[in-house]
From Swiss-Prot:
One of its GO terms (molecular function) is alpha-galactosidase activity. It catalyses: Hydrolysis of terminal, non-reducing alpha-D-galactose residues in alpha-D-galactosides, including galactose oligosaccharides, galactomannans and galactolipids. It comes from Arabidopsis thaliana (Mouse-ear cress). It is found in: Secreted, Cell wall; Secreted, Extracellular space, Apoplast; Vacuole. Belongs to the glycosyl hydrolase 27 family. May regulate leaf (and possibly other organ) development by functioning in cell wall loosening and cell wall expansion. This is Alpha-galactosidase 3. The active site is at residues 193, 248. It holds the Pfam family Melibiase_2. Substrate binds at residues 115-116, 191, 226-230, 244, 248.
Amino acid sequence: MVIMKKMKDSVLFLVVGLFSLSVLVSQSIAGRVKAPLLQSNTGGLVFSKSFNSIYDTSMYGRLQLNNGLARTPQMGWNSWNFFACNINETVIKETADALVSSGLADLGYIHVNIDDCWSNLLRDSEGQLVPHPETFPSGIKLLADYVHSKGLKLGIYSDAGVFTCEVHPGSLFHEVDDADIFASWGVDYLKYDNCFNLGIKPIERYPPMRDALNATGRSIFYSLCEWGVDDPALWAKEVGNSWRTTDDINDTWASMTTIADLNNKWAAYAGPGGWNDPDMLEIGNGGMTYEEYRGHFSIWALMKAPLLIGCDVRNMTAETLEILSNKEIIAVNQDPLGVQGRKIQANGENDCQQVWSGPLSGDRMVVALWNRCSEPATITASWDMIGLESTISVSVRDLWQHKDVTENTSGSFEAQVDAHDCHMYVLTPQTVSHSDV
């Protein structure tokens, strides 16, 4: 959370091709294997010998959640970035309605997540969490029923501390009771924050809620919000479906770019079942330009970050809806191969001319040319840089223009990119037969 931060106590030799995703994911979730997510049988026709080191996934570990969730990054909406504590059941219902009427729900934005301030300031006489009687008078169960009736899922918020960041009751030492009541209400998602944690290490505080959620018998997405304090990518793959790798995002260019760089560090650790989380989307909140928001959405999608809308979807501009509803970029984020793309090269003053890329199913690549400079720049992605064999020919599709740029390009690809803008492409090999997973 932003407002109460001062109250913390302590704060892939050759690969891709046809990928046996479902087998590996199911085994990983059962905790039976620890192996790279990318498997080789392309025979070296597409990818260079350096591909394995560029897109390393060997650090991805075993999952212990047993909830079968997060095979692709979660998509939905969260109340905090726009509403903060100014939430109530009407806002949540209207947001669910807007996700459906705008078409966003059909694109995958299915989680409607309530953040802090939903509960009363005190537990009841039996020690149970209670919805605030003025803002959620109908209770969470009826609200969940309404959200479910729209084909969506309801998320809720708590904290791995004695209080939430806004000083509502936390779930530390109440994990079993709170998990049980969340399940009884029909909750589908839990964001679990890190305030008022009594100085207890996150690696000790977060597993009890995992175990309590598992014990309910209900599949509840478990989102760890530890702010990256103790490098959760190193251990949270055994605990949650996603883990925050950074402090809170703000609706500024500086905050968004900094967080993208911090999250990039942990690319090798993410994959189906558990994802690095660089925090929610700020698109539509007004602090950045249209071009900057395009970059925000492009890089979050390429990084396989959760796509959680943070604006008021009831009152979106056409530009905001255009960005959030880009089906081709959403498809990159939700690609079944599930490998986080990463920053491959940075040139220019302050490394502002950047190439980000990653593998997709069907021997394809996604490439983002991101100009973080203050002037237009020509940015080049070479095959050697992104791990393609130098002789391979590809077709190039522009995901923002929704058109094929070229059908036969080899060696490299470049584009003129405006200041603070981002171009995003899918490269498909033309000389190899392949099938999408």
